[in-house]
Structure formats: structure tokens, C-alpha cells
């Protein structure tokens, strides 16, 4: 009952926020297009207002996704994909902390993680997790997304350990703890990521031991034909 009430409240908030955010965004575009040329100071102010408005619109969209997933009204796609290949492709395009000389790469088993899932949503979930972990690393280090297949209680799963390269195995062997979704600057992308992963029958957790400055572990069950 409480979960249903929370989902209804979130849905109402999304509806109430969406219209004013869209109106403000539209007026800002009109201001830039129709007004006399702005000086540098005013242009910067409008640019910052547009960025903030775009962030608010993105947050409303994330709230909508969370609300729909909680209410069970969003159907996750089911298509065959190799999760390890998806992780590899994502890792090649991640540059979240490149300015601090933090490198990111996929390692471990390159293929063989056949799952049935929603490719677009899984990509967004893993991208959010990667950004969160990279933000917490010290300068000049290498973070890896280590890919392996592991069996637990007779069920084989694709396991991805995201951690600084020297702490991967320790993170994998550590007791599981709750993954902190309340990291600043990432909006609702991490709560959304957890819901997407759990919607695929998987789990997202952090190592309980103090290994490195941040790590995340994801496990998704393989397709029955691949177990």
C-alpha cells in the first residue's frame, strides 16, 4: 500500500513539474531568438538558465521513468543480447573523469553473456553506474569493468565488477552491501539503474569491505539456453 501511494505521489509530481518546466524552456528559447542581440553577460545568464532548465526537464523525465517502473506500467523490452559486448561498447565511449587522468576499460570475458533484455535501458543503467564510480576515484588511476560468468544456487549469471583495477577481486569476494544511490550530481539515474537491473531479474550491490574509493557489482541471470 505504501509503495503504491508513493508511486502515485511521484506520478502526480511529474505531471505538475512537466508543464512549467516546458514553458520556461520555451520562453528562454524565444528570448534568445526574438530579442535584440544580448551582451556577453546577459547571454551567459540565459545560457545558464537554459542549462538549468534542461537539467530540470531531464530530472522530470527520470522521475517519470521511476514512477512507471514502480507502478509496473513500463514493459521492459526483451531481445537477445550479449551483455559483455554491451559493456565493452559503453566503456569505449566513457570519458567521465579523463580530465583527472582516470582511465576506464572493460576487461575479462569478452563474449558469452547472452541475456534477454531491454538493450537501451540496460545501456543507460550501466552508463549511470560507470559515471558514479569514476567520479569517486583519485586522479591518475585505472578503473575497469571486469566481466565474468559465475554460478550461484545453480543459476549462471553475467557478473560485472566496476572498481579500481587493484581492488577488483577483493570487491568481488567481499560480502554484499547496499549500493549508495544518493550520490550528488547524478539526479535519479542511479535509482533508475537499480530498478532497471532488478526488472531484468538482476542485482546491484557494493562490496561491504572498504576496498578502493568506490565499487559496484552487477549480476544478471543468463538466458536459460546459455546456462
Residue positions per predicted region:
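A conserved beta-strand-to-alpha-helix junction within the catalytic ATP-binding
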Residues: 77-91, 123
Amino acid at each position: 500500500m505504501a509503495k503504491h501511494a508513493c508511486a502515485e505521489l511521484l506520478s502526480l509530481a511529474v505531471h505538475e513539474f512537466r508543464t512549467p518546466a516546458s514553458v520556461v524552456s520555451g520562453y528562454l528559447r524565444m528570448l534568445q531568438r526574438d530579442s535584440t542581440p544580448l551582451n556577453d553577460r546577459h547571454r551567459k545568464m540565459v545560457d545558464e538558465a537554459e542549462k538549468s532548465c534542461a537539467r530540470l526537464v531531464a530530472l522530470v523525465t527520470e522521475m517519470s521513468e521511476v514512477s512507471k517502473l514502480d507502478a509496473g506500467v513500463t514493459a521492459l523490452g526483451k531481445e537477445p543480447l550479449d551483455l559483455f559486448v554491451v559493456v565493452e561498447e559503453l566503456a569505449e565511449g566513457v570519458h567521465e573523469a579523463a580530465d583527472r587522468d582516470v582511465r576506464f576499460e572493460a576487461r575479462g570475458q569478452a563474449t558469452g553473456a547472452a541475456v534477454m533484455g531491454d538493450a537501451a535501458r540496460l545501456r543507460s543503467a550501466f552508463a549511470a553506474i560507470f559515471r558514479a564510480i569514476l567520479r569517486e576515484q583519485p586522479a591518475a588511476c585505472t578503473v575497469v569493468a571486469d566481466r565474468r560468468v559465475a554460478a550461484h544456487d545453480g543459476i549462471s549469471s553475467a557478473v560485472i565488477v566496476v572498481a579500481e583495477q587493484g581492488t577488483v577481486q577483493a570487491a568481488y569476494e567481499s560480502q554484499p552491501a547496499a549500493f549508495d544511490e544518493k550520490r550528488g550530481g547524478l539526479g535519479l539515474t542511479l535509482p533508475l539503474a537499480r530498478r532497471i537491473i532488478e526488472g531484468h531479474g538482476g542485482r546491484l550491490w557494493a562490496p561491504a569491505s572498504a576496498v578502493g574509493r568506490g565499487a559496484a557489482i552487477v549480476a544478471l541471470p543468463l538466458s536459460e539456453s546459455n546456462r
